[in-house]
């Protein structure tokens, strides 16, 4: 399929050790490859292995993650690193079953680590792979459904286990599928079909369904919160507070704020006479 024709250069592919693959895959969730590269380099320099990550204080690993967002990702990385140290002697396991027991690792990440780092014949099905396979097969199933993802994983698993005896290299196959979806079989009805190695037998193209496949239900609308924020200064210092350990932006620091939009007079009155009930002091 021409698996190396459109592989992007990335630091985690130069030396696909399990730790590098793991960190990169978690960083790449909800984040573009080019945006991840400098954060990956900084993180690896500071925390080059599982042992260093497991021993890292929270404030430090949160600071290293600063700018990537979705901070639960790095909290889960730290918790999983502690698991690996305690249960596996610091060695990242090489089977999907064991990887799935680690905090924050789902079926895609487990498949990516097992196949890319250890060359195990297991699939790594992300959004790109779902799109590619759905189009090649003209499958109009809703890819947002877990049952559809699971069925695709089972089909790819069976195929890979068979084809590995015919020379299929799992790490290259999975990376090629990911790259095909990211660079050629792109979303939003604008794929580069003429560049695709599967051009001749892509059923969605042959049936003129490229614009309608894959089928994907809309995500829930974002909840919007309205708050009044207080920037309280004392010389060069600004007052901050730490958010609760659970919930939205758990454990991060924020400017003091209260629910709702207050007029200037209301805000000034609240600032000069705060009470625990209004939330400014909590």
What is each of the regions a protein language model found here?
Residues 210-258:
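N-terminal strand-loop-strand
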Residues 15-16, 222, 247, 273:
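A short beta-turn/loop motif at secondary-structure boundaries
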Residues 8-192, 198-207:
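Catalytic cores of DNA base-excision repair glycosylases
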Residues 251-273, 277, 282:
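The catalytic Nudix box helix
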Residues 16, 117, 244-245, 259:
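Structured beta->alpha junctions
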Residues 1-9, 271-276:
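Conserved small/polar residues in nucleotide/adenosyl-binding loops
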Residues 173, 179, 192, 226-227, ...:
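A generic structural signal for well-ordered coil/turn residues at beta-strand boundaries
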